[in-house]
From Swiss-Prot:
Protein's UniProt name: (3S,6E)-nerolidol synthase
Induction summary: Up-regulated by alamethicin treatment.
GO molecular function: metal ion binding; S-linalool synthase activity; terpene synthase activity
Protein species of origin: Selaginella moellendorffii
Pathway: Secondary metabolite biosynthesis; terpenoid biosynthesis
Coiled coil: none
Length: 368
């Protein structure tokens, strides 16, 4: 485990400016919609103290939904944002559970997803997911809902395997990690299914089963995970949970003499390669299907999950520390000084041209 000792001694690294050529947008009503989503969460979780409120608001989950589905109808976007909050918390709950708790927890979540549970849950996270799923089942058409339930079930099984491996603190192989993270990320449900739901896309069975549809799902999921593992590394580093991160995996399987910076640079190259893959698939689908195809509509909208995730990963206090003045809505690059409390980057920041809104709420907005 010498690689982990090398990681534990890292104090800083150079963060390049990540590419973001995938079309990016944010819902024009993002301020009021994200506020509504986050206020709903504060109310449901009965969060009253100012410090905890600040953490919720600076996590910017409501804003994340507005970036993932910028062209959604308002009411569907609000529901997608509620679902995003629920899945984030369920993911945290799953990853903090022991391997002995996992089978029952998986069964409970599966039952909540498919509506087979009448139990009253004392765990507020499970109660929250139950309420969200009641809304989703009422709003989502049955074929899409069936696919959603299948996606959640597959992700739960994959998370169970991941928890077992994390308990052993073992580092998987490169391809093994890639496939495992695809499976555990809930991205097909949170990104793919929710894109279809929010935009009103109706894919045929043939389109769903086509290889190029699966390629696009995988490529967007891989891009989201690569960015996540890079920009959340500080949080995982100080949480002691960096065995399952692209940086650890690449370092462990790289030739002798490979530096931490070499691995960061390689990870950034992988992000760029995945971006190019997404753009190529987007064009290929449009060329083959035509502009009116439902699959073309999906290929136009779904990649925004990747670009939205990239931007959100730069502005969330969940990764970079709450109350951090660095999080202004700009993409940053430069020397990243690892610090237990917050992301510190010196000296350069580069404004992102595609982001043309302030993260500050309007004066008329108020929080509970």
């Amino acid at each position: 485990m010498k690689d982990l000792f090398r990681i534990s001694g890292v104090t800083h690294f150079e963060l390049p400016l990540l590419p973001n050529n995938i079309p990016f947008a944010c819902h024009p009503e993002f301020q009021s919609i994200s506020l509504k989503i986050d206020k709903w969460f504060l109310g449901k979780m009965r969060i009253a103290d100012e410090t905890s409120k600040k953490k919720v608001l600076e996590s910017r989950i409501g804003l994340y939904a507005c970036m993932m589905h910028p062209h959604a109808k308002r009411e569907k976007l609000v529901l997608a944002g509620k679902h995003l909050w629920a899945v984030f918390l369920l993911d945290d709950l799953l990853e903090s559970s022991s391997k002995h708790e996992m089978p029952q927890l998986n069964l409970t979540i599966s039952n909540l997803a498919n509506g087979n549970s009448d139990e009253d849950y004392t765990n507020p996270l499970l109660a929250l997911y139950r309420e969200v799923m009641e809304e989703i089942r009422a709003a989502m058409e049955p074929p899409l809902l069936d696919r959603y339930v299948q996606c959640v079930g597959a992700s739960l099984e994959a998370v169970k395997d991941q928890v077992h491996r994390r308990a052993e603190k073992s580092i998987p192989g490169v391809e093994e990690y890639k496939l495992a993270r695809r499976a555990t990320g809930f991205m097909e449900a949170v990104g793919g299914i929710m894109t279809e739901f929010c935009i009103g896309i109706r894919l045929s069975q043939a389109q769903i089963q086509s290889p190029i549809f699966r390629e696009l799902l995988n490529s967007v999921s891989d891009h989201v995970i690569l960015v996540n593992d890079l920009l959340s590394f500080r949080k995982e580093f100080y949480g002691g949970d960096y065995h399952h991160n692209w940086i650890s995996v690449l370092l462990h399987h790289s030739p002798r003499g490979t530096s931490f910076q070499d691995v960061v640079d390689r990870l950034c190259e992988m992000i760029q390669a995945e971006e190019l893959s997404i753009l190529a698939l987007r064009k290929k689908i449009a060329d083959e299907e035509g502009s009116d195809s439902e699959l073309t509509k999906f290929a136009r909208e779904f990649p925004m999950v990747a670009s939205g995730s990239l931007v959100w990963s730069y502005v969330t206090g969940r990764y970079h520390g709450y109350g951090n003045p660095l999080l202004t809505g700009e993409i940053f690059s430069g020397t990243w000084l690892l610090h237990p409390m917050a992301t510190v980057v010196l000296p350069s920041k580069f404004r992102m041209d595609t982001m043309r809104f302030s993260l500050a709420p309007k004066k008329r907005d108020s929080f509970p």
